[in-house]
């Protein structure tokens, strides 16, 4: 490197800096065991890679500026891991990688996320599913390394605003099972009214016995309107509640009134004829 400091003759410096000098001084550059990048623009000639603070298992990137062309080299300090970059990476990219991840994790993830040429043809894509990339970037979160398939075209929205959708049942299937529905549920249809009655809280109607009806008719013949004392006495003798006795007397008066009206109409019709 004495030619850069100005201690060597001018003719020697011209040979060292000129572009064809790479062939004559290839022995001095081969000792560094680096990769030469000849296709670099002249705008990046002044850039140099900063040496990242890495352990013995990582590689160190640096560059030489010989006039206008730029030569980038990477030195590997480990014999087990050999990472060779086949394309030019600027200095900002090296700074991002070294700042985001430690050096040990960077060397291990470089093996884990290696993309092989036959990776795209190793599995067949299923139509109707969305493929999520299995291999994320180096700075991605480690928990996102999962292959997920989301169905896209099999989803249907069920509108349940007023009930079930009308297109849920097929008419062809119903024609085959109409006789089964009639035979199995024919006994249940007459009891629908009773089931509705139970739902409204009404009790099943229990007819009165002959002894109870005889006692009620006897009291009704004595008086069409019942008092509180008589109601208690009839309830005790007939084993009925006071409310049942009161309702029976009301129904009996309505029945008698209808009978009287009907008989009066029939009598008037007879006289008119």
Swiss-Prot record:
**GO cellular component terms, semicolon-separated:** nucleus
| Entry superkingdom | Eukaryota
Q: Which SUPFAM superfamilies match?
A: Homeodomain-like (SSF46689)
Which keywords does this chain's UniProt record carry?
Developmental protein, DNA-binding, Homeobox, Nucleus, Transcription, Transcription regulation
Q: Name one Pfam family in it.
A: HoxA13_N
Q: Which GO terms describe its biological process?
A: fin regeneration; regulation of transcription by RNA polymerase II
Keyword Secreted assigned to the entry: answer is: no
Q: Which SMART domains match?
A: HOX (SM00389)
Residue ranges flagged as DNA-binding region: 201-260
One GO term in the molecular function aspect is: DNA-binding transcription factor activity, RNA polymerase II-specific
Kindly give the PROSITE patterns that the UniProt entry links to this protein.
Answer: HOMEOBOX_1, HOMEOBOX_2
Q: Deletion: any effect? A: Morpholino knockdown of the protein results in a biphasic developmental delay characterized by a reduced body size with 22-23 somites by 24 hpf; the first delay occurs before gastrulation and the second during late tail bud development.
Compartments annotated for it: namely: Nucleus
Q: Which InterPro entries match?
A: AP_axis_regulatory_Homeobox, HD, Homeobox_CS, Homeodomain-like_sf, HoxA13_N
By its UniProt entry, which Gene3D superfamilies does this protein fall under?
A: Homeodomain-like (1.10.10.60)
User: Which cystines does this chain contain?
Assistant: none
Q: Which family does it belong to?
A: Belongs to the Abd-B homeobox family.
> What's its job?
Sequence-specific transcription factor which is part of a developmental regulatory system that provides cells with specific positional identities on the anterior-posterior axis. Plays a role in early embryonic development.
Protein name listed in UniProt: Homeobox protein Hox-C13b
Lineage of this protein's species? Answer: Eukaryota, Metazoa, Chordata, Craniata, Vertebrata
The gene it comes from is: hoxc13b
């Amino acid at each position: 490197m004495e030619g850069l400091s100005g201690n060597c003759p001018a003719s020697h410096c011209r040979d060292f800096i000129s572009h064809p000098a790479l062939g004559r001084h290839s022995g001095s550059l081969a000792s560094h065991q680096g990769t030469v990048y000849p296709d670099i623009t002249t705008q990046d000639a002044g850039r140099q890679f900063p040496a990242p603070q890495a352990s013995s298992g990582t590689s160190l990137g640096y560059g030489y500026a010989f006039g206008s062309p730029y030569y980038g080299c990477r030195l590997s300090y480990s014999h087990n891991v050999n990472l060779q970059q086949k394309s030019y990476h600027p200095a900002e990219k090296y700074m991002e990688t070294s700042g985001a991840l430690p050096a040990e994790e960077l060397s291990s993830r470089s093996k884990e996320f290696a993309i092989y040429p036959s990776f795209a043809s190793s599995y067949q894509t299923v139509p109707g599913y969305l493929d999520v990339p299995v291999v994320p970037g180096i700075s991605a979160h480690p928990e996102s390394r999962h292959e997920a398939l989301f169905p896209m075209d099999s989803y249907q929205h069920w509108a349940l605003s007023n009930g079930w959708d009308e297109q849920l049942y097929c008419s062809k299937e119903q024609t085959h099972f109409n006789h089964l529905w009639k035979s199995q549920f024919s006994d249940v249809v007459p009891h629908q009214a009773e089931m509705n009655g139970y739902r409204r809280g009404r009790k099943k109607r229990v007819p009165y016995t002959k002894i109870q009806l005889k006692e009620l008719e006897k009291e009704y013949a004595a008086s069409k309107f019942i008092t509180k004392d008589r109601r208690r006495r009839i309830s005790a003798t007939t084993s009925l509640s006071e409310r049942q006795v009161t309702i029976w007397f009301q129904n009996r008066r309505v029945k008698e009134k209808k009978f009287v009206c009907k008989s009066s109409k029939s009598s008037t019709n007879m006289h008119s004829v």
